[in-house]
Amino acid sequence: MQCALYDAGRCRSCQWITQPIPEQLSAKTADLKNLLADFPVEEWCAPVSGPEQGFRNKAKMVVSGSVEKPLLGMLHRDGTPEDLCDCPLYPASFAPVFAALKPFIARAGLTPYNVARKRGELKYILLTESQSDGGMMLRFVLRSETKLAQLRKALPWLQEQLPQLKVITVNIQPVHMAIMEGETEIYLTEQQALAERFNDVPLWIRPQSFFQTNPAVASQLYATARDWVRQLPVKHMWDLFCGVGGFGLHCATPDMQLTGIEIASEAIACAKQSAAELGLTRLQFQALDSTQFATAQGDVPELVLVNPPRRGIGKPLCDYLSTMAPRFIIYSSCNAQTMAKDIRELPGYRIERVQLFDMFPHTAHYEVMTLLVKQ
């Protein structure tokens, strides 16, 4: 991938950009095999990759510069701002949005937040695009509600320029810390969720719900999980850390009992909406802590699917799964180190299948999915 920002030394986020994709995949596979070296693996499936540029469905832009000349991008460690509107990881459809946002920031008088001086209002711009219809969700992260009336007043101009903006919100993040969002979300549009579709499964994205940033690879990840589950004698499963329900909605069949658990209520609202559209009455989603939910249950499903954050599922849940001993565990992870650590805490299981998904090209990161079978 050619990147003018990298060539000019202005951005180093894609640390592996100079390596061809096949070399990157080889290095990631070697890393994964090294992490799982202590465990016999029955089958290594071929790694899955997608486009090497223009694949991201989300931009998280730090807003800096001045209200007349805002910059959208990032801050270097020394506080120097960098405009990343030309980042080749973004699809071409993002360029007109960035181009319209800069004059809009001036029109609405949204002074960029200055970290050093602790002054200003507009901290971040968060943009998400749906692959299914090109609709977009735009979030303005502000320090306070001071400029909210001005923003509302100027908004019709932006909506006229960018009719693809289906969901627009303001998020209030009052803390002087590098935290992307606060708890308060104010909707400026009637529509509150962005419609998405992977493999004919309807999905919804709400402002504070996690959604994978590489749709081409994520859709293959979900389809693979569905294929693995269909090959197993499973009538009852849990989907823990389920997010908007991507895994559960793909794996569920009309006669399967499936419970999806996720701590973020916004994500659960999305999952419930999808389940209703699919008419899956035996599929239920609840906004709870995954570990607390699992350890309080006496009824054990045949399969537990986990897709935890980078920290992994942790010892309490590993201990519980070891004791309750579901026949199958599918572990999807964005951090193979913590996954390997967790598998070590599940001594009664063997690894039947492992597959790497290159969700984050040009970096050392990757997603991995593992099928564990009770011995």
Curated annotation (Swiss-Prot):
User: What keywords were assigned to this record?
Assistant: 4Fe-4S, Iron, Iron-sulfur, Metal-binding, Methyltransferase, rRNA processing, S-adenosyl-L-methionine, Transferase
Q: What is its EC number?
A: 2.1.1.189
**InterPro entries reported in the protein's UniProt record:** 23SrRNA_MeTrfase_RlmC (IPR011825), MeTrfase_TrmA_AS (IPR030390), MeTrfase_TrmA_CS (IPR030391), SAM-dependent_MTases_sf (IPR029063), U5_MeTrfase_fam (IPR010280)
Q: Show the GO MF annotations.
A: 4 iron, 4 sulfur cluster binding; iron ion binding; rRNA (uridine-C5-)-methyltransferase activity
One of its Pfam families is: tRNA_U5-meth_tr
In terms of SUPFAM superfamilies, this protein maps to: S-adenosyl-L-methionine-dependent methyltransferases
User: Where along this sequence does the record place binding of S-adenosyl-L-methionine?
Assistant: 212, 241, 262, 307
Q: Where does [4Fe-4S] cluster bind?
A: 3, 11, 14, 87
Q: Where is the active site?
A: 334 (nucleophile)
Q: Does the keyword Calcium apply?
A: no
UniProt key word Hydrolase: no
Enumerate the CDD domains for this protein. Answer: AdoMet_MTases (cd02440)
Q: Which reaction does it catalyse?
A: uridine(747) in 23S rRNA + S-adenosyl-L-methionine = 5-methyluridine(747) in 23S rRNA + S-adenosyl-L-homocysteine + H(+)
* First-tier enzyme category under EC: transferase
Biological process GO annotation list? rRNA base methylation
Concerning its family, UniProt says: Belongs to the class I-like SAM-binding methyltransferase superfamily. RNA M5U methyltransferase family. RlmC subfamily.
| Classification via NCBIfam families | meth_trns_rumB
**Role:** Catalyzes the formation of 5-methyl-uridine at position 747 (m5U747) in 23S rRNA.
Q: What is this protein called?
A: 23S rRNA (uracil(747)-C(5))-methyltransferase RlmC
